[in-house]
């Protein structure tokens, strides 16, 4: 079975639950007292998808303003980006649109984008309507899912959908030696003035 490494980065404001999503996916655990990420953290998880193994190389980026300039370093070369907002904080959804804009301008051209509305277990204090977020995700051709890292809602489904959207390895086969070969130019004899 073929193994594919897929770099995935998580973007979004501080406190939206990016680290909790990663911990729930990789370790199947939830820590209500998790500390904010400083810079970025890295974890991996391998899952089977159809006839391939997908090894997710997950970069969880810091959401604080001071670390925003580092984000391009993490999403460069990514197969997918998960942009997370908190359904209980409208401003995190507004900021999400800036992340999408930056990703479209500076990220890989074929990156798979997923929008994750986290903390869907807090439905009574919702500020971002699911329909509005879904409509926005559809308008930018992104995956949309509401998640709860706390209650393990739609976390695995999010990564399965990313696997589904990433072109299969068969769609981009290696060139099979049909590239070109670099050769040295024959050097001309050295001329001397003496």
From Swiss-Prot:
Gene Ontology BP annotations: endocytosis; intracellular protein transport
Chief site of localization: membrane
Annotated GO MF terms: GDP binding; GTP binding; GTPase activity
Effect of residue 64 to L: Impairs normal protein trafficking through early endosomes
Coiled coil: none
Keywords: Cell membrane, Cell projection, Cytoplasmic vesicle, Endocytosis, Endosome, GTP-binding, Lipoprotein, Membrane, Nucleotide-binding, Prenylation, Protein transport, Transport
Disordered: annotated segments: 170-194
Family statement drawn from the similarity comment of this UniProt entry: Belongs to the small GTPase superfamily. Rab family.
Protein name: Ras-related protein Rab-22A
Origin species: Canis lupus familiaris
Species classification: Eukaryota, Metazoa, Chordata, Craniata, Vertebrata
